[in-house]
């Protein structure tokens, strides 16, 4: 089909988005809506001695000034961490990741209330919520809130926070070390290092970052008193998970919460975890009896959006005299911030520590440390880029140490196609790939062999020129369960409902191409349904390269279900046996005759024919609900070439080439 899988088509989303007809969170306004403003901590670490709100409440137009004490009094519960900190050991073993077991038993859970209660643990943590008729009034009222802090020494540096003498982020904890785990074979690894001809070492810090999506986080919440239901419209990475989390925080049944998100202006992982303002606007709406809207400003987003990376690594690589890798050992120290929101980046990075290279034995120590910083969560590949950076730097250091060309030392140690499936020392199994071919093709695209000439030309201009190469592998999985429903409507439209949620990935287009090919229906006839928990019962959202991989399977299963049910209805219509009905290009044909019915005719018959079996009557739809256990291992290679002006330090990326096998 010209609009099927792999065909170049115009994106379905763009016709709506380029004319400003998208429906983002800030486009939503409800009748009698109020505005909320969060007063945030100016301290990284401090006890809250008192909060005085009387002057703020007296300001005309102020409807409520709420604190952590009010929140606890109303029974609002902490924001739950992701499953990485709470999942039982046996459940973790069923996933493709390395299991990190804390040496001192179960992990301590750090209650993360939507507003700080007794103590603030990072700059930007919410301390009070002001609800007013307008945002300007709410901001003015926030300036009238008096907070008496007892400032405490903060622990912000990742390495220093892990030291025994560091200020305690949590008074009840013996140290700031939240997780202390190790994986691999220490004795065998140490012997390999003792016998090695060469050892290279790397100590590095991968800095903290945040996502900065084009659409800042926004939440519009409403409590409907007659039904007792909460409604939230907020851009996120997946509405179903957030529905469950909100129900947990508010202490209600999941069916009493509806979460909606239509167009999402970027994510990068920062929107996959629930933000404090999401339960706050719902709770505040119940308190004031009106809808409440919160819109995060860019300046406060830098303080209070979830953040990523922040990893201190100390790693060694052992080699024999011919440059073959013998072993790796080291430690990863992940700064998870003031609360134990996630250890996924640490776990993922350790899982694929060796990249696409053969490393016979290894031993790693993995630490997570709490600090007086914004919590970190899975962000843009969650720990894997850090691991790839570390491994590729070790390759370059090994080349310098041994005198072997940096490309040749990689070739000698790449996992070869005939060695796949390949099991790493930590038990992760790469299923397939051709890593050397990806490297070769990237180098060819980058014209690697002619680099010396280009560098000489730059030198004549007084410029420096450099080129670098990095091989990489991913481990995609994320939330392991996904769902889809495919429904063929008599009027010539196909509805495809999914539990994923696009934030710019183009699901309306790519998913429609898949279903168009499978059902043989026009690309234009397919409508994607997503982002509404009253319609979508199951789904993990979009993260970790899971959307097409998981939703594609579910959509394919559901499409097959529609075809098989349609075959039986078509057999009834054509007066033949189901085995004598062939399906092709959207039509069901009676074998050996010219008689046929289209899939939309079948959909109409399913609802109109009275002599159909009860099992075949009704809307022509099928569902698929699948739990996945196997990870995916996309891989590739990137080459970057830069030119630098040594007088000014100005850097220009003059060439970038990459091969990515998904």
PLM regions with names:
Residues 35-48, 126-132, 380, 391, ...:
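Short, well-ordered beta-strand elements within core beta-sheets of diverse protein domains
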Residues 77-83, 93-95, 252-305, 345, ...:
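Active-site rim segments in enzyme catalytic domains, especially the processed small/beta chain
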Residues 2, 73, 103-105, 110-113, ...:
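Gly/Pro-rich active-site capping loops and adjacent beta-alpha segments
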Residues 131-132, 276-282, 313-324:
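Active-site-proximal alpha-helical scaffold in enzymes
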Residues 405-413:
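Short, well-structured alpha-helical segments that form the helix of a local strand-helix-strand
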Residues 165-250, 414-493:
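Helix-loop-helix junctions that connect adjacent transmembrane helices in secondary transporters/permeases
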Residues 1-178, 199-202, 277, 287:
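Flexible, low-hydrophobicity surface segments
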